[in-house]
């Protein structure tokens, strides 16, 4: 008899797992509380402006292409992606700008401010991150390893310690090899992919730089939601039954097994396996009602990553100095991280990510206008949440900073504005305290690991998404779905012997 898989949540991790399970011959039902598939890969359109509500950067497209190849299909027949050789532009408070290109040589050619020594150091750092990326790919990505003990067993103690560089934090690894203060800050902010601090995260996450340099940075034509639409189409073609607007209220358990889910309609649906794309702690807390003692232990070890104050602005002018992807850096990177991740306050001088897809895709804003998305990282929801007044003051601080750093009269030109706070993120995606990136990567707290993909309490419950390994970011959550499918397939094959 064909076994039934229930997937809770239609984010990229959930839809990826559903596709692989269906490709492997299982009966798969996916339940998504929202009316779209993709989770945080969401879309907002108004007054002629189009915005990616969630992630705006696509990296490692081969992870997505594999899903189509398993079905003997080509991703290019479903969605169009475009490589961006000019990866992003960094603005600094003193007026310095640095353009990051795909390739160290190209970066040197486009930045007269960078010396020969700067480029040599950048190449040396790339070589260092390549070594980490290669060893990470072998075990962490290809085999879905989940813990430090699994890493050590797979690679050997000395090999793991040296090549994963567990001795240093990410920022220590950068500062050891890079002397240019602008490059130090720019490279440190690659940690944005996982919503953490480069001063706390382990050096293994330096591999994010090599990953982007080697695999490229891509734009999904028309908006990144088209990638989610492509995966939804593939899932339906493979026989996945997708229910949108369908909320799972709880997971039924018996001893150490999960038996099915209860929907908000009252209907009970049985399952042989459950894969939750809802974050781990909210799953245990709200769907299973795990006891307080065990929940508290998990919350101490796996603290939420950062959230964000997200502004979608329709602007009645153009700023020629902007690239597609832009970063407006803080005067004091350490203080910014300290305020967000330790003091848990809205930062005085935030680093701001600004994406302007209209620079590449002119369909995203009316002629002569621009669609600007602004994202500074801020703390997840605290026991005493920020107030409406706090957010209003922070909004002014953001606009003041952007105007001071070159976006002249930005306030005057805003003709459309939509804002998401951590509370909106929590409400729409049931994320843990409004975190965007799942679990924080912290060398001391969790050695940079997120939750394992297999439940430690229920033998047929699995997790995918940003709160589990291999981590946040759209390629990683998609890979987590494929890794969970591999684990279930291996388990079933073993049971049949």
Swiss-Prot record:
Pathway: Carotenoid biosynthesis; staphyloxanthin biosynthesis; staphyloxanthin from farnesyl diphosphate: step 3/5. One of its GO terms (molecular function) is oxidoreductase activity. InterPro entries: Amino_oxidase, Carotenoid/retinoid_OxRdtase, FAD/NAD-bd_sf. One of its GO terms (biological process) is carotenoid biosynthetic process. It catalyses: all-trans-4,4'-diaponeurosporene + 2 AH2 + 2 O2 = 4,4'-diaponeurosporenal + 2 A + 3 H2O. Keywords: Carotenoid biosynthesis, FAD, Flavoprotein, Oxidoreductase, Virulence. Signal peptide: none annotated. Its EC number is 1.14.99.-. Its cofactor is FAD. The keyword Membrane does not apply. Disulfide bonds: none annotated. FAD binds at residues 7-19. Belongs to the carotenoid/retinoid oxidoreductase family. CrtP subfamily. Involved in the biosynthesis of the yellow-orange carotenoid staphyloxanthin, which plays a role in the virulence via its protective function against oxidative stress. Catalyzes the oxidation of the terminal methyl side group of 4,4'-diaponeurosporene to form 4,4'-diaponeurosporen-4-al. This is 4,4'-diaponeurosporene oxygenase.
